[in-house]
Amino acid sequence: MKLDLKILDARMRDYLPAYATTGSAGLDLRACLDAPVTLQPGETTLVPTGLAIHLADPGYAALILPRSGLGHKHGIVLGNLVGLIDSDYQGQLMVSTWNRGQSEFVLNPFERLAQLVIVPVVQAQFNIVDDFAQSERGEGGFGSTGRH
């Protein structure tokens, strides 16, 4: 799949989104910063990537997801948990960065911060009904299928 990428900050030419391995599902996104940013515990900040994408095809969307190592080791996750990039969005990719950890965290310029995953999208149409055909599960939720 070819994807239109617009470089909004010339410094990002050296830090384009890339797959870390041949089996990677996510492209690494980097922090487009002029200087280090310190996030105190509980603090959230919006970090620019210096890049914009245009998927164009409504059959696709992009998800911005946290990097597992940053979340597990440092408590750095996304403030909005998942960023959804619609196919018609053309603005800069921004990363809502939240320090849910107990220690301050310093984010350095061009550090890998999040990952971008391209996913297929199905736009559903609703069929209004009065009742559903009975399923085995029915209305059971939140633990209704058991713990183990």
From Swiss-Prot:
UniProt superkingdom: Bacteria
Cofactor requirement: Mg(2+)
GO function terms (MF aspect): dUTP diphosphatase activity; magnesium ion binding
Annotated catalysed reactions: dUTP + H2O = dUMP + diphosphate + H(+)
EC id: 3.6.1.23
Listed pathway(s): Pyrimidine metabolism; dUMP biosynthesis; dUMP from dCTP (dUTP route): step 2/2
GO biological process: dUMP biosynthetic process; dUTP catabolic process
Gene3D superfamilies for the chain: 2.70.40.10
Residues at which substrate binds: R67, S68, G69, N80, L84, I85, D86, M94
Catalytic EC class: hydrolase
Keywords in alphabetical order: Hydrolase, Magnesium, Metal-binding, Nucleotide metabolism
Summary of the function given for this chain in its UniProt record: This enzyme is involved in nucleotide metabolism: it produces dUMP, the immediate precursor of thymidine nucleotides and it decreases the intracellular concentration of dUTP so that uracil cannot be incorporated into DNA.
Record family assignment: Belongs to the dUTPase family.
Protein name in the entry: Deoxyuridine 5'-triphosphate nucleotidohydrolase
Originating organism: Burkholderia vietnamiensis (strain G4 / LMG 22486)
